[in-house]
């Protein structure tokens, strides 16, 4: 049993890639990020993740000792860093720059260390370090969103872990959309942060009442997807 990770409730938990560690984030009032040796039921590291709600935590699939948290008006990039006083969690807050702050739910780390996240405005942000490298928008008028409303899911698919082929996104509008990974990974912005990307394909998911489904997660099975 894992105790004292947060005062009231956990908002999200996840395992490391090798399954040896567990990361949890708590809700109000403490908003704690805790990394556990879950088999030994011991806390390895803990730190206050943010001052508002945290939706998600994930270990880096590529670099040991790195994590990402996101939630209300923020995304934060963490390292388990060796200091003079021992191992500590150090977190860099993502700086939105000239872009409007956004809640962040879905995100994915790319093999080269950049991070791709969704926004509540239906765009994607490409991060390099804790700075926005580009805001990805759709074809059409300026600032055309890729989705209507919050993007809850950002996944890398196809190819291999080191060389994915596509990015899948989904969220509030009920659409699952597919984008070219190479086009996103190589996006470069000029005078404005916006970079237009092209839609490869899409699938609309409808709820039992006929309305668009609000998609909060996609889980891949052997021969199917669970939405």
Model-derived features: positions:
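Tandem repeat protein-protein interaction scaffolds
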Residues: 1-37, 52
């Amino acid at each position: 049993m894992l105790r004292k990770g947060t005062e009231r409730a956990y908002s999200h938990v996840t395992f490391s890639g090798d399954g040896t560690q567990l990361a949890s984030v708590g809700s109000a009032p403490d908003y704690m990020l805790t990394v556990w040796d879950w088999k030994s039921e011991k806390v390895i590291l803990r730190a206050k993740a943010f001052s508002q709600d945290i939706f998600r935590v994930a270990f880096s699939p590529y670099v040991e000792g790195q994590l990402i948290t996101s939630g209300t008006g923020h995304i934060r990039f963490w390292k388990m860093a060796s200091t003079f006083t021992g191992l500590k969690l150090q977190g860099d807050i993502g700086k939105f720059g000239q872009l409007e702050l956004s809640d962040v739910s879905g995100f994915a780390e790319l093999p080269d260390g950049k991070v791709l996240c969704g926004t509540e405005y239906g765009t994607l942000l490409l991060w390099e370090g804790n700075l926005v490298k580009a805001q990805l928008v759709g074809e059409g008028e300026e600032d055309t969103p890729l989705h209507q409303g919050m993007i809850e899911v950002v996944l890398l698919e196809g190819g291999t872990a080191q060389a994915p082929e596509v990015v899948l996104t989904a969220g509030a509008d009920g659409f699952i959309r597919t984008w070219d990974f190479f086009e996103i990974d190589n996006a470069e912005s000029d005078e404005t942060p916006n970079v237009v990307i092209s839609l490869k394909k899409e699938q609309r998911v409808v709820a039992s009442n006929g309305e668009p489904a609000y998609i909060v997660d996609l889980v891949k099975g052997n021969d199917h997807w669970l939405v």
